[in-house]
From Swiss-Prot:
The gene is TFAP2A. This is Transcription factor AP-2-alpha. Residues 334-464 are annotated as: H-S-H (helix-span-helix), dimerization. The modification Phosphoserine is found at residue 293. Residues 482-491 have a biased composition (Basic and acidic residues).
Amino acid sequence: MPPRLASVKIPYDWGRKGPFRFWRIFCQSRAVGWFLAAACGRAGRFRTQPAEWPTPDAVFSPLGLALFQDRHDGASNGTARLPQLGTVGQSPYTSAPPLSHTPNADFQPPYFPPPYQPIYPQSQDPYSHVNDPYSLNPLHAQPQPQHPGWPGQRQSQESGLLHTHRGLPHQLSGLDPRRDYRRHEDLLHGPHGLGSGLGDLPIHSLPHAIEDVPHVEDPGINIPDQTVIKKGPVSLSKSNSNAVSSIPINKDNLFGGVVNPNEVFCSVPGRLSLLSSTSKYKVTVAEVQRRLSPPECLNASLLGGVLRRAKSKNGGRSLREKLDKIGLNLPAGRRKAANVTLLTSLVEGEAVHLARDFGYVCETEFPAKAVAEFLNRQHSDPNEQVTRKNMLLATKQICKEFTDLLAQDRSPLGNSRPNPILEPGIQSCLTHFNLISHGFGSPAVCAAVTALQNYLTEALKAMDKMYLSNNPNSHTDNSAKSSDKEEKHRK
């Protein structure tokens, strides 16, 4: 080396001042760091799992400083030694692994823990004393080796924190063969586990013993299969075997969750009564079930209006919780199935009361006689009287057949569910009409038809009077015949 160049000494802080100051500023610039990080793929925009963008100071500043320090330290032997990089960035970057191009016998690769999985130790397993029927055959089980980068000292420290050993693969929750099912605590009747609990149970009753089912107290109920009734499996124990035997069970071994449909759900004040005579009507569980079932399928808002529940912030939720207690299901966001009428707001007790009062008014206050006389005067022609009388008689007979049919209606109403008399086809149609009208329909129609029958009766009487007035001879003949009959009867 020429003496001129040999006398030149490279200062220690050449990267901090001098011609290489621009290089240090260039490496520490944030824009250049972002550009180089994106070019290297560290912060790819379209990657499925984008990594965190590293700060330029963490990526380039130690590298630039270490580069010039290495040139200063390795000027004599010409070898680039980069292990000093860890000393430069030791304070802010202690977790960075040391870089070295020379083989090291004590080198251990960094440990990257797997994704977090909850670990349950075997000592805390309450079913460890029970033979696992779903466990794999140990002869065919493939043991998984430990991670090569797991130090023994770190394993002992981690085991103290997690109360388990990560080296046992069969204890991990992800590899536990019993994770897909659970045993119910009811099966463990004694301290001996399943041995004493399942020994007394038949095989066909095992599915029923798994679930918690409350015992049925009323054995004489008969509930139709409706969608609003919650259903559950029947618990066939010895204590309630007699009670369950009398309950109708369908093919799926399910029964209605409503224990007593005749139980009073709430009392509702009437809408149509005056303030001086306010009356309350009792609403049974069966009536609430009919409001939630077809054809109406009322939602929580409409049902709350029928039951006169005050509007509140959590009114729908509280109503659903109250219905859940009696075994009725009212899903949130339900849409009504039928059009809302004025009869929808009436409970069945008030609707029947209204129909009864309507029938009483039709029976006592309808002007059947005045209407009959008025219409008969419009048909005073003697040639039409015979034909008209026959028409009135035929109409009266048809009305009688119609009222007799409605009298045989056995639709469920209130807490009564009578046995049907009519055929199922016509009875289902009448039941639909009564469910829509809350029990007002059939009695109201009967009251109206009864008023029509009263008109027909008065019309026939008026026609007889008109016929006798137009034919006085027939009247005298009839009177003579009647007098002769009376004399014969006296003799």
